[in-house]
Amino acid sequence: MTVITIAKRGLPKLTTSTSSTTTASSSSTITSVASSSSSLPLLSNSTSSSIIPSITPPSRNGNPYILDSGDMPNGTVFIVVGGIAGVIFLAILLWWVITTYSSHRLTRSVQDYESKMFSTQHTQFYGDSPYMDYPAKENFQDQVHISESDISPGNKDESVKDALVSHTNNEKPFLSNFERPLSSLVSESNRNSLFISPTGDILYKTRLSKLYQESPRLLQKPVIMTSDNVSTNSLVSTISSSSASSLDNGNEKEVGEDIRKPAKIASSPSRKLLNSPESDGSVNRNHSKGNLLVVQSKRKPTPSTYLEHMLEGKEQDE
């Protein structure tokens, strides 16, 4: 069994002391002593305080050293300077956008113009040009076809000669795709590059040969109808008939075959009819009679001369 004993306590006593110092400090001490005796605990408390004066700015009235801002808000100078700088920056940005757009537009228009003017599709090797005033077909037919009423027996050779010249002049702009240049560097019209292809001219002539072989419609044009019950269906047959009348019977077959094979003559100019002794006599007779099919021998140019002609843009005669 546990016995609890409660001791009596007296009321505490409060002791107060006040002191003033330069530092503000406050401390309160309460001491309580519990003992079996009847003495009461003691409580001690100390308080310190200090006075700080307030700072008052000087008045602007009558003071020349203080700027009077008046009614303007604070930061007016910053706002003005920032606005001017912003306007200048926006003006520069707007000018850059306008000039860039105009330059791109001008460049695009110039490129389109150059692509249309200097593209290979508008050259003489690609058929009709959009800048021509008349179609190529009508020009070809008008200059090559000859009516019978305009031809008399006396000037038959002259008419055939005119037809041949007209056909040769109109043949070059209206060739098919076989006569297209191999490359812009190999083209005769391009003199901006020093590149010279040693095989470009040979391949170009080969394409010309294929043109004559695969496009006979350029040569098979009705030209005239003779009064001797002999119908001529093409320019080649007309030339053959006019030339055959002025040749001997022994040389008629040989000359006719050479006329009907222009590809071999164009592709290999060194193979002439003058290689055989029989053809020498026929050529002399043809030259004396004014025949159109006289094949004259010509010395082949030296390589240096050939290169000079190519650089100067001169056409090589076949």
UniProtKB/Swiss-Prot annotation:
Q: Where is the composition biased (Basic and acidic residues)?
A: 250-261, 309-318
Keywords, A to Z, come to: Isopeptide bond, Membrane, Phosphoprotein, Transmembrane, Transmembrane helix, Ubl conjugation
Q: Where is this cross-link: Glycyl lysine isopeptide (Lys-Gly) (interchain with G-Cter in ubiquitin)?
A: K314
Compositional bias segments (type: Low complexity): 238-247
One GO CC term of this entry? cellular bud neck
Superkingdom of origin organism: Eukaryota
**Annotated region described as Disordered, given as residue ranges:** 238-318
Q: How does it sit in the membrane?
A: Single-pass membrane protein
- Protein's cellular compartments: Membrane
* UniProt cross-references to InterPro entries, sorted A to Z: PRM
Question: Residue spans with biased composition (Polar residues)?
Answer: 276-285
Which positions bear Phosphoserine? S129, S279, S282, S288
Sequence intervals crossing the membrane: 78-98
Question: Which stretch is the leader sequence?
Answer: none
* Similarity field: Belongs to the PRM5 family.
What this protein is called in its record is: Pheromone-regulated membrane protein 5
Query: Mind giving the lineage of the organism this protein is from?
Result: Eukaryota, Fungi, Dikarya, Ascomycota, Saccharomycotina
Tell me what gene encodes this: PRM5
